[in-house]
UniProtKB/Swiss-Prot annotation:
The gene is lipA. It comes from the Bacteria. It is an enzyme of class 2 (transferase). Its EC number is 2.8.1.8. [4Fe-4S] cluster 1 binds at C77, C82, C88, S317. Its cofactor is [4Fe-4S] cluster. The keyword Transmembrane helix does not apply. This is Lipoyl synthase. Gene3D superfamilies: Aldolase class I (3.20.20.70). Residues 1-31 are annotated as: Disordered. It comes from Cupriavidus metallidurans (strain ATCC 43123 / DSM 2839 / NBRC 102507 / CH34) (Ralstonia metallidurans). Binds 2 [4Fe-4S] clusters per subunit. One cluster is coordinated with 3 cysteines and an exchangeable S-adenosyl-L-methionine.
């Protein structure tokens, strides 16, 4: 057992009478009902290497937002409060989040809202396909909330989005960042077999020791199995996964996860610095130095990853097109 500190959240109380499962819960409301051990921690000062590019006045930032709203679409960029939103929207790129904006999980590192999801929007695949065509995107990332309420975890909705996007934009490469389909993995993979993406991504997020705190409802071995089983069914489709640092892990634990990834045939890797969305989320326990990120990158290539995007501001879908291109997949 490692002696590294465990990231914890501040305590918020919520009575059963206050809980409304149909309401989208964010921040304190979302994390209030998770039994997280509370350890007072001083908020760390951000180092100089943590820098975010803001949207500029002549960027496409507001144009992209208007197009998304007009088509009733959601991006994880907005819902998860991604620090790179200004840069990505400014370049006319976005990671689309399908199946609503209410997740059935309550991961306390994530800023996506929790609640009882709405019924699937049958028009969403068409709206998404038309938006991608309108934006003339060469590479898109499609992700989603967890939908534990659906028998297939939302796999058929992914297939509908992929197939309709390919009908209108046959030259567009499609990466999906999927949930874990826990409890329905074989059914989900059977469905995805009908129309697999160009890149299959599922994030491990953190080291196994921290799963109980950071990913309640998820299972480390299951996430590895998802990617390996998909790869066995689709050997020509690259697989990808991502990790955060700063939740209480050690460098050696990160390297161990990377080894597990390669042992499960994962091709591409992303590692970035965790930044707490609010005081009600898991706190940052450390800011990893650029030299350490460089070490992770060098070790990744030694292990045989085809591409490793590693750095403080790296996120799973940040510059995903460039990641795939550099890996030789796009």
């Amino acid at each position: 057992m490692s002696d590294a500190p465990i990231a914890t959240s501040s305590e918020v109380t919520q009575s059963p009478a206050d809980y409304d499962p149909t309401k989208k819960q964010k921040s304190a409301e979302k994390t209030a009902r998770i039994p997280i051990k509370i350890v007072p921690a001083e908020k760390l000062k951000k180092p100089d290497w943590i820098r975010v590019k803001a949207a500029t006045g002549n960027s496409r930032f507001y144009e992209i937002k208007d197009i998304l709203r007009a088509n009733n679409l959601v991006t994880v960029c907005e819902e998860a409060s991604c620090p790179n939103i200004g840069e990505c929207f400014g370049k006319g790129t976005a990671t689309f989040m399908i199946m609503g904006d209410k997740c059935t999980r309550r991961c306390p590192f994530c800023d996506v809202g929790h609640g009882r999801p709405d019924p699937l929007d049958v028009n969403e695949p068409g709206n998404l396909a038309r938006t991608i065509a309108q934006l003339k995107l060469n590479y898109v990332v499609i992700t989603s909330v967890d939908r534990d309420d659906l028998r297939d975890g939302g796999a058929q909705h992914y297939v509908d989005c992929i197939s309709q996007t390919r009908e209108l934009s046959p030259n567009t490469r499609i990466e999906v960042l999927v949930p874990d389909f826990r409890g329905r993995l074989d059914r989900a993979l059977d469905i995805l077999q009908a129309c697999p993406p160009d890149v299959m991504n599922h994030n491990m997020e953190t080291v196994p020791r921290l799963y109980k705190q950071a990913r309640p409802g998820a299972d480390y071995a299951h996430s590895l199995k998802l990617l390996q089983d998909f790869k066995r069914r689709n050997p020509n489709v690259p697989t990808k996964s991502g990790l955060m640092v700063g939740l209480g892990e050690t460098d050696e634990e990160i390297l161990d996860v990377m080894r597990d990834m390669r042992a499960h045939d994962i091709d591409m890797l992303t590692i970035g610095q965790y930044l707490a969305p609010s005081n009600h989320h898991l706190p940052v326990t450390r800011y990893v130095h650029p030299d350490t990120f460089k070490m992770f990158e060098e070790e990744a290539y030694k292990m045989g990853f085809t591409h490793a995007a590693v750095g403080a501001m790296v996120r799973s879908s940040y510059h995903a097109d460039q990641q795939a291109h550099q890996a030789g997949f796009a």
